[in-house]
Amino acid sequence: MRVYVNGIGLIAPGLNGWAASVPILAGSADYIAGPLTIPVLEILPPAERRRTPTVVKLAIAAGCEALANAGQAAAKIATVFTSSGGDGDVIHQICETLTEPEREVSPTRFHNSVHNAPAGYWGIATGAHEPSTSLCAYDASFAAGLIEAATQVSIDGHSVLLVAYDAPYPE
C-alpha cells in the first residue's frame, strides 16, 4: 500500500497554521504557549457560523488549511474525521441541563452532540457530496483515522482528507 501526505493543516494553542508551526516542530524555534486561535470560517454561512461549536470550527479550519496546502478542492474529496471523544463541551452542557428540573436540551446542542457533526458542517460549508467517515477510538483515534484514510485511498484510488481534532474537556 502506498499513500502520501499532500497537505497539512495544523491549529493548536501557540501553533497557528502549518507554515508557522514547522520551525517550532522542527526544533529550530521555541514554542511559546498561546491561546487557541481559530480563523473566521467565511466558508460557513453566517447562521451556521453562529451555532457551530469551537471543536467543529477547529476541525473545519484544519481541513481547509490542509486542502489549501495540497491545492485540492474540498467538494470532490472524501473525508475521514477522527476525534478521541467528540465535543466534550457540548456533552458537558447537555449533562448539566439534564440535572435541572426542566431538562430542556437545546435542539442545537443536541444536533451538535453527535460525533459526525464536523462532517455535517463540512458538507454544508464545502458542498461536498463525497463519502465521509467519522471515527472515535479514544487514544488511538489518530491511528484509526490514518488506517481508515489509507484503506480508502488503497481500495478506491482517490484522495482522502483526514481531519483529526480534539479540544480540552471542561473542568
Question: Residues of each region from the PLM?
Answer:
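Conserved "HGTGT" condensation-loop signature of ketosynthase/thiolase-family condensing enzymes
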Residues: 1-134, 157, 164-171
